[in-house]
Regions:
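ATP-dependent adenylate-handling active sites, centered on carboxylate activation for C-N bond formation
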Residues: 1-155, 170-180, 195, 200-206, ...
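Conserved S-adenosyl-L-methionine
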Residues: 15, 156-165
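Short glycine/proline-rich, acidic loop/turn segments that cap or connect secondary-structure elements
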Residues: 180-192
Length: 233
């Protein structure tokens, strides 16, 4: 709301309940072809948003902000990098894997509802420009400082410089807490152990939430396709 007021733009707020999100978990995992926990969590609100756009507007092209964290090392755990070499190495690894995680989420959620996605931060020229930045400038107590400085004056100062929130966290902790409780109720200890056993050591579920997503994925795509996801984030 604050950004919309600052820019004098007409924004539509779309809300959903955790229960509505849970009722669409099958649809989300079917669209994603993934069982990665972070991806499923973040995809559910985006899937519902794209559904709303399709049903209630004439928009067919949507802009989304994926890519800047991978390109500029914006994830909070990047603060733990012991040196610039480790920072850059993880930076490049995340960029190479984006098609399995955030890129997959954005593409599949939009595509599931017949929408075309435009991702400016993944434009080749932008990526190439970011790769020419002195890597030491990317390592900063404030993540993505270079990008924040570029948008000075275009966003409210406190919004521009606040700490990053993950997408599934930013829509409200109530969503994550509720889906965790749902998984606890759906997956008992016996089922959990069976799912772990049938994973045959590949991306072994560590929580009941991970086991829930894995079981839903298996129902749709079978256990032979576990390898579609190289790791669980």
């Amino acid at each position: 709301r604050k950004v919309a007021t600052y820019l004098d733009t007409d924004h539509t707020e779309v809300t959903f309940t955790p229960e509505e999100g849970i009722s669409h978990l099958n649809d989300v995992i079917h669209s994603l072809e993934s069982y990665d926990t972070t991806t499923v969590r973040a995809s559910t609100p985006m899937w519902l948003l794209c559904k709303y756009i399709k049903q209630h507007t004439s928009c067919r092209y949507i802009f989304s902000g994926e890519g800047s964290d991978e390109i500029l090392g914006g994830y909070l755990y990047f603060h733990n990098a012991p040196n610039v070499e480790e920072f850059v190495g993880e930076n490049m690894r995340r960029l190479r894997l984006i098609h399995q995680f955030d890129g997959l989420r954005a593409d599949r959620c939009a595509g599931a509802h017949g929408l075309d996605l435009v991702v400016p931060f993944l434009d080749k020229e932008f990526i190439n420009a970011c790769m020419t930045i002195n890597q030491n400038e990317k390592i900063d107590p404030i993540e993505k400082r270079v990008l924040r400085e570029a948008f000075e004056g275009y966003l409210p100062h406190d919004i521009l410089w606040r700490q990053k929130d993950g997408m599934s966290d930013a829509v409200g902790t109530n969503w994550v807490d509720t889906v965790k409780k749902y998984a606890e109720a759906e997956i008992d200890s016996k089922m959990f152990n069976e799912i772990v056993s049938k994973s045959y050591g590949y991306n072994i579920p560590l929580t009941k939430e991970e086991a829930l997503y894995r079981s839903l994925f298996w129902r749709m795509y079978g256990r032979d396709n576990d390898h579609l996801i190289s790791e669980i984030w």
